[in-house]
Each structure stands twice: as C-alpha cells, then as structure tokens.
Regions:
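N-terminal intrinsically disordered, cationic/polar leader segments
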Residues: 1-135
Length: 135
C-alpha cells in the first residue's frame, strides 16, 4: 500500500538590483546562501563564459553551471562578479567566482535550478530576477 503526498522541496531566490549584472550576481549569492547561510569567502578563483539566446536561458545556464562546478570541483561558489553583453540575438555572460571547499563547511544540497516561476524583468528601479531551486 502507498499514498501520494504533496511535498514542497523548493527554495526561491529573488534579486533586486539597479543593473542586470548586479541582479545576476545577487541571484548567485542567493544560491550560495541557500547552500550555507554562513558568510563565506573562497580563495580559488574560477571563470565562466556562457552564451544563450534569451536572458531567461542565460540565467538558467549560469546557475546550472554554478551547480555543476560545485559538484565537479567540490567548492561552493561565492563572491560572484559578472559582465553581460548582447550581440545580435545572443546574450553572453563572462564571470568569476571564488570557491569555498565543500569539506570545510556545513551545507545543504541544492539539486537543480528550474524554469518554474522564473522571472527576468526590467523594472522602473532596475531589474528583478526570481528563481526556484529544487532542494
């Protein structure tokens, strides 16, 4: 016998910023805080270069890459800096972050970024980004 039960296993992050780059960096910092609420600083610098056909897919690919690199390099990405440009129909993100070794911190696992309720919106005060992660 079994029963299906509703279960929420998500965490959402909102970033409000004057610039698109600050909003992307804010969402990435939110991802770091969702992993570990402690204030952390990494020592090893990592570089990212991501291209996509929309801002939503660029945001998804950026966060997905941070989760992937967390798993591959066993570091929690922190202190994110990004530059975003558009050339024709293609958006490009170049960025850096510092990695905190996972074996030195207590953290919960964020499994994946989702498109569920994702929002990338220009506002009168700058930018609003909203992302839901599976935990």
């Amino acid at each position: 016998e079994f029963h299906l039960r509703d279960h929420t296993a998500d965490i959402a992050v909102e970033s409000l910023a004057l610039t698109l780059e600050e909003a992307f960096s804010g969402i990435a910092e939110g991802l770091s805080q969702a992993h570990s609420p402690n204030s952390l600083s990494g020592t090893k610098k990592f570089h990212l270069n991501i291209s996509s056909e929309s801002l939503e897919s660029l945001l998804f690919d950026f966060l997905d890459m941070l989760i992937y690199e967390r798993d591959v390099y066993n570091v929690l990405p922190t202190n994110h800096k990004v530059s975003i440009t558009q050339k024709g129909d293609i958006w490009n993100l170049e960025g850096t972050y510092y990695g905190v070794p996972l074996d030195t911190i207590e953290s919960r696992e964020i499994k994946a970024v989702t498109y569920s309720d994702m929002e990338v919106k220009k506002t009168p005060n700058g930018w609003r980004l909203y992302v839901v992660f599976d935990v």
